[in-house]
Design a protein with these regions (language model features):
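Metal-dependent nuclease catalytic cores in nucleic-acid-processing enzymes
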Residues: 135-152, 358-369, 401-404, 588-604, ...
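Conserved oxyanion/phosphate-binding beta-strand-loop segments in alpha/beta enzyme cores
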Residues: 61-65, 74-116, 191-204, 312-340, ...
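Residue patterns forming the tRNA-binding/recognition surfaces of aminoacyl-tRNA synthetases
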Residues: 62-73, 77, 82, 90-91, ...
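N-terminal catalytic cores of NTP/NDP-binding nucleotidyl/phosphoryl-transfer enzymes
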Residues: 107-168, 230, 292-294, 299, ...
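Extended active-site and interfacial segments that coordinate phosphate-rich ligands
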Residues: 131-139, 290-323, 350-355, 367-373, ...
């Protein structure tokens, strides 16, 4: 039969460039890297059915030797001074991927943890939005993997119909070729050529962010498996009566010549003009008219009514009369009353153009107005526009207004700020038009999706977005699913014609064909079989040329990637539904809600039970990043400069669920320093082991675990060790709980505080006296505990900063092949509350002494004497035992420092010679003034300070006591000035007291 039918081949799988080899010997501490394997293709493109390729040479490493094999690590001298991210990131990533750590651990006993990656456009280049979702999803994935769950983070890319077509069209135009110069098949071939060359770019860029997703399962929305899913979904929905062809208003992109989704339309405030003109009343004289205002005078040619508010006394008497549409040969339209009309806008009379305005379209449907289309698909005026036929819409506006002025119909034109709809892809002005398209009924599909939130089966974080979600689904409109593009999922509809001649005539008069008869099928053969069964043998088939909206295939993503419609596919059984969907709040309706509706419709299940929404990444001033503002921060540039870990930690710790993040470049630099702090902590631990043999270093691994194993073991440790282990255990619980609540910012900040404050600034600083003291056994205990705490801290930090933690862990003595495969620190471990309290008191002692040293400008290296008075016997004993630690941290002269239960006689006899520091009701510290500073120099310094402060007080006092200032200035300003004066006077009193103290010492 002569069918005129042709099925376009679709390339279904992506190919990716083999990553550059990197020497990972440093990362593996002597373990030779496996031979590199090429990245798997996502499919093939040929006339035959493609074979899905999966390179799985090595699965998740679970053997006992890999999990427990010991390594002494490296030597301190082997490590560079600072963390060199550029030297390790590629090698570590390659090691993780090649050794199978990104695949699900099939032997894991925990519940599966599955995240479907929101598929970025295959045309895309990495931006901060990608960096945000990759960071957060990787934090979740790495944490779940370490917590023993069978973890799958499933990656992929979207074919991005409009974006890709636009990119390829621009490339062809640069070569002097237009899309219309070639056939559809030739253009599609060019698209596939482009994808083969550039399609893997976004994948490689996502890898630069450390994404630990299973690349062996990578999917593409046009691969064969997903194409089969799309066909099945369309046919299923059509068979249920949910897909239909109808006429409706759509967003039309004249240059692309396709309908676009609401998401692909961006509104911008732009300077424009509001045109006021006379709408002549039929049968009236020159003064019989309705004054009307419009921003688009060219659409007057498509008016089918003029509306006034029935409550408007100026015009309500004209309801029922008719107006004559200018330049249409006398065509008349009714004047109608409608409460929609805003009496305060413009003139209070509204021209109604149902064919080119969404609001007018709704009014027209409600009152039964005609719909007149005045534009061709390319944005030129059509034959309904008389002499303006063929004129571009923008030129028509200018010409028509000039004609209105010439005819005396123009009243005035004044500046007006318009909200202009523009194509997100091409930037062109979108034209609302009424068009015949394919639609999907949404009200029925929305019901179970609404119920899921109402019953709590689906949780949206943050919760406030549940209200938005419900509002959208409650007032949902049918979804326009057809697009007039050449690339994408071609709609599986075949129109039925009686003959080839009939088809040819239909094509001349109607792009879609005049026949309303059609069949829905999976392929040519099935279409022919169905058509013959319904209409007989003497027929010709013509396939629908439109393709499906990209969001249609994306809406199937959570289950199509797992093998649906094959319900028995292993991944459908093991990894569907997903655990969580993480994405930006801006696509909650356009993608998330549609996935939920499609999943219920196709599988009867929710696609995931939790939706976590992040906000936009803005610049430091809170502005949206854009090329026009010159404020775009390139994540790849940040990675090259500051390192991947610094970027990830900045994004993760700066995020609050659903809130936008203002990206501070200073914070990036600070977090780069944080990664170096982790590096230096590792070097410190290695330096403390420098004299140990490999066997002794390995022995520390198990010794540290034993010393910190439980309450009984921890109780035997010195105070500082009990404190740091307890702080670690409490931090593990807090971080785990925060991550379980998707509060990644709090989790990251908690780890930062523990590492920087507790571990590095307090514990490591204090440990030096024990590590390098005369007591060898105490030194060994401290080494073992320090190694244990750093190991567990690295595990805790790893999901956030994977590279520096892996590199440091590889350098330390350890068991196992890689940090990525280690267990999460124990949750609910013992916290020694009394030890924490005692050490916090010790910290207060040290902090107060440090403050006093700063106030008296004591040189940092100078050690001073002190008297610590603890009236509580138990505390007295505890601080006496920790005198070396206190002296180390506070820079005290340990030989001249005592711990007593009451002030010594020399203090009691001359308290004026001491600085008294009250820590709490039972704890005081006395510092001899003579030991703090040179009295003569200090008197001179303080006297200068006194003079300066007195001058400031005199000036501020005059201002505060001025009736003019008090009576005229705002009350808040006056109160602020009085507070400043009070503070200065208090500080001056302190300075004078110190001068007196020092002068007393000089006189002696």
């Amino acid at each position: 039969m002569a069918s005129g039918l042709r099925t376009l081949a679709r390339a279904t799988l992506t190919r990716h460039a083999r990553p550059a080899r990197a020497n990972v010997a440093r990362a593996l501490a002597g373990v030779a890297p496996a031979r590199a394997s090429p990245a798997p293709a996502a499919g093939t493109r040929s006339g035959k059915a493609p074979v899905r390729v999966a390179v799985r040479a090595r699965g998740y490493p679970t053997s006992a030797d890999v999990k427990t094999m010991p390594s002494p690590g490296r030597r301190h001298g082997d490590l560079p001074k600072n963390f060199e991210h550029e030297a390790v990131e590629e090698g570590l990533y390659q090691m993780w991927e090649e050794r199978g750590y990104f695949r699900p651990n099939e032997s894991a006993t925990g519940a599966p943890f599955v995240i479907p990656m929101p598929p970025p456009n295959v045309t895309g280049a990495l931006h901060m939005g990608h960096a945000m979702f990759v960071t957060l999803q990787d934090v979740m994935t790495r944490s779940a993997r370490m917590r023993g769950r069978k973890t799958l983070w499933l990656p992929g890319t979207d074919h991005a119909g409009i974006a890709t077509q636009l990119v390829v069209e621009r490339k062809l135009e640069s070569e002097g070729v237009k899309r219309t110069d070639m056939s559809r098949e030739e253009f599609v071939e060019k698209v596939w050529e482009w994808k083969a060359e550039y399609g893997g770019r976004i994948q490689q860029q996502i890898k630069r962010l450390g994404a630990s997703c299973d690349w062996s399962r990578e999917r593409f929305t046009l691969d064969d498996g997903l194409s089969e899913s799309v066909l099945e979904a369309f046919i299923t929905l059509h068979d249920r009566g949910l897909i239909y062809k109808g006429t409706y208003m759509v967003n039309w992109a004249p240059k692309l010549q396709t309908a676009v989704s609401d998401l692909e339309v961006e509104y911008s405030e732009e300077p424009g003009t509001l045109y006021f003109f006379k709408y002549p009343v039929e049968g009236g004289g020159p003064d019989d008219y309705l004054p009307v205002a419009t921003t688009r005078p060219e659409t007057i040619l498509g008016d089918t009514a003029v509306a006034v508010n029935p409550e408007d006394d100026r015009f309500k008497h004209m309801i029922g009369k008719k107006c004559v549409v200018p330049f249409t040969g006398g065509r008349t339209v009714p004047i109608i009353g409608d409460s929609y009309v805003d009496m305060e806008f413009g003139t209070g009379a509204l021209k109604i153009t149902p064919g080119h305005d969404p609001n007018d379209y709704e009014i027209g449907k409600r009152v039964g107005l005609d719909i007149i289309n005045i534009m061709n698909k390319d944005g030129t005026m059509n034959s309904n526009c008389g002499k303006y036929n063929g004129v571009d819409r923008a030129d028509c506006r200018t010409q028509l207004w000039a004609d209105m002025e010439a005819e005396g119909l123009a009243i005035k034109a004044e500046p007006y700020t318009n909200r202009v709809p523009r194509s997100q892809r091409g930037g062109e002005v979108i034209e609302p038009i009424v068009s015949e398209q394919w639609f999907c009924k949404m009200d029925t599909m929305a019901e179970p999706s609404l119920k899921a939130v109402e019953t709590g089966e689906l949780t949206i974080i943050p919760q406030r977005f549940e209200k938005i979600y419900k509002s959208w689904l409650t007032d949902i409109r049918d979804w326009c699913i057809s697009r007039q593009l050449w690339r994408g999922h071609q709609i599986p509809v075949w129109y039925v014609h009686d003959s080839a001649e009939d088809l040819a005539r239909a094509r001349e008069g109607d792009r879609k064909g005049a026949s309303k008869r059609y069949v829905v099928a999976r392929n040519d053969a099935e279409a022919e079989e169905k058509a013959k069964a319904q209409y007989g043998d003497n027929i010709v088939l013509h396939r629908e040329e439109d393709v499906l909206d990209t969001w249609f295939s994306s809406g199937l993503w959570p289950f199509s990637t797992c093998g649906w419609p094959n319900e028995e596919a292993p991944d459908m059984k093991n990894y569907f539904p997903a655990s969580v969907l993480e994405t930006g709040h801006d696509i909650l309706f356009f993608w998330v809600a549609r996935m939920i509706m499609m999943s219920y419709g196709m599988t009867g299940k929710l696609p995931f039970h939790t939706v976590f929404l992040h906000g936009l990444v803005r610049d430091s001033q809170g502005r949206k990043m854009s090329k026009s503002l010159g404020n775009v921060v390139d994540p790849l540039g940040v990675i090259a400069d500051q390192g991947c870990d610094a970027l990830r930690f900045t994004l993760a710790t700066g995020t609050t669920p659903g809130q936008d993040l203002n990206l501070n470049l200073d914070r990036l630099a600070s977090n780069r320093n944080f990664t170096n702090k982790i590096w230096n902590a590792g070097k410190f631990v290695l330096y403390s082991m420098e004299e140990m043999t490999d066997e002794e270093r390995v022995a520390l691994i198990d010794e540290g675990s034993a010393l910190c194993a439980d309450e009984a073991s921890i109780a035997k440790l010195p105070l500082a060790e009990r404190w740091i282990v307890s702080k670690l255990n409490a931090t593990v619980d807090h971080v785990t709980n925060a991550q379980d609540k998707y509060d990644f910012g709090e989790a990251g900040r908690s780890m930062y505080t523990f590492f920087y404050d507790s571990f590095a600034d307090w514990f490591i600083e204090g440990a030096k006296s024990r590590l390098y003291g005369a007591d060898a056994e105490a030194a060994r205990v401290t080494k073992a505990v320090t190694l244990y705490v750093l190991d567990r801290t690295l595990r805790l930090l790893h999901p956030f900063v994977p590279y520096v933690t892996e590199e440091v862990w590889q350098a330390l003595p350890h068991r196992g092949e890689a940090l990525i495969g280690q267990d999460w620190p124990e949750i609910g471990a013992f916290v020694d509350a009394p030890a924490v309290s005692s050490f916090e008191n010790l910290q207060m002692i040290v902090t107060r002494i440090r403050n006093a040293r700063a106030e008296y400008s004591v040189e940092p290296a100078k050690r001073i004497p002190a008297v610590i008075v603890a009236t509580d016997a138990q505390a007295n004993s505890a601080y006496g035992a920790e005198i070396n630690l206190i002296s180390t941290l506070a820079r005290l002269d340990v030989a001249e420092t005592v711990v007593a239960s009451a002030p010594p006689d020399e203090v009691a006899a001359a308290p004026e010679n001491y600085v008294q520091i009250i820590v709490n009701d039972s704890l005081e510290v006395y510092l001899p003034l003579a030991g703090l500073a040179d009295p003569v120099k200090e008197v001179a310094r303080l006297t200068k300070q006194e003079t300066k402060m007195q001058k400031e007080i005199d000036g501020l006092s005059g201002r505060v006591n001025s009736p003019s200032f008090v009576n005229k200035a705002p009350a808040a300003v006056v109160e602020k000035a009085r507070k400043e004066l009070s503070d200065l006077e208090e500080n001056l009193a302190v300075v004078r007291s110190r001068i007196a103290q020092m002068q007393a010492l000089v006189s002696k």
